[in-house]
């Protein structure tokens, strides 16, 4: 058990039959009445975000999340196969379970698979990935360097906005948290 007074961003807790990650919190001490903690929580199973208020000093159960380094192997129909780097055990996760992560997953990529009481609840990607551009309009000579962009499709099928100088075959460094272009690889 952990006191809500000890909340930190990124802490995982078990409340209301769900596993939640603390995204944001604020200790509030009104002039009248007792203090409380206002928090913003993300459900690790569904991805839903909820705001919840706790009384100051209230105790909640801390959820112990196990992180295992795994390697993404391949897609098998709608399922995706990962291999544990230590035990070489393989697990399959359905495609709808991965959501946005599919935009960045490529064969042999190392990821962190998160589980709670042996139930897989998420896949954490590296902060950046390098993906090759498979389709984009050619840059025209004389294009300005004033931040103009065009769309490009990378090897996973994900489409993003890139600067005009990016060409097919270029390798891009992409931020996995928001899907934005960082640089050429």
Curated annotation (Swiss-Prot):
GO terms for MF: translation elongation factor activity
Name of the protein this chain belongs to: Elongation factor P
Gene: efp
Subcellular location: Cytoplasm
InterPro entries: Elong-fact-P_C, NA-bd_OB-fold, Rib_uL2_dom2, Transl_elong_fac_P/YeiP, Transl_elong_KOW-like, Transl_elong_P/YeiP_cen, Transl_elong_P/YeiP_CS, Transl_elongation_fac_P
Lineage: Bacteria, Bacillati, Bacillota, Bacilli, Bacillales
Any single biological process term in GO: peptide biosynthetic process
Primary location: cytoplasm
Alphabetical list of SMART domains matching this protein: EFP, Elong-fact-P_C
Alphabetical list of PROSITE patterns matching this protein: EFP
Role summary: Involved in peptide bond synthesis. Stimulates efficient translation and peptide-bond synthesis on native or reconstituted 70S ribosomes in vitro. Probably functions indirectly by altering the affinity of the ribosome for aminoacyl-tRNA, thus increasing their reactivity as acceptors for peptidyl transferase.
Annotated metabolic or biological route of this protein: Protein biosynthesis; polypeptide chain elongation
Family: Belongs to the elongation factor P family.
Keyword Repeat: no
Cellular component, GO, one term: cytoplasm
Keywords noted in UniProt: Cytoplasm, Elongation factor, Protein biosynthesis
């Amino acid at each position: 058990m952990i006191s809500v007074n000890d909340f930190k961003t990124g802490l995982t807790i078990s409340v209301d039959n769900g596993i939640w990650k603390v995204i944001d919190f604020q200790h509030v001490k009104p002039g009248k009445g007792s203090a409380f903690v206002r928090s913003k929580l993300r459900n690790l199973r569904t991805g839903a975000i909820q705001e919840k208020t706790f009384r100051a000093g209230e105790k909640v159960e801390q959820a112990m999340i196990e992180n295992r380094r795994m390697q993404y192997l391949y897609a098998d129909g709608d399922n995706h196969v990962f291999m544990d780097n230590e035990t070489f055990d393989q697990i399959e996760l359905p495609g709808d379970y991965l959501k946005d992560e599919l935009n960045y997953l490529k064969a042999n990529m190392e990821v962190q698979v998160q589980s709670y009481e042996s139930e897989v609840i998420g896949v954490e990607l590296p902060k950046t990935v390098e993906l090759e551009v498979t389709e984009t309009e050619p840059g025209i000579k004389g294009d300005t360097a004033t931040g103009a962009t065009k769309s490009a499709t990378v090897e996973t099928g994900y489409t993003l906005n890139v600067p005009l100088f990016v060409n097919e075959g270029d390798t891009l460094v992409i931020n996995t948290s928001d899907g934005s272009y960082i640089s050429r690889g």
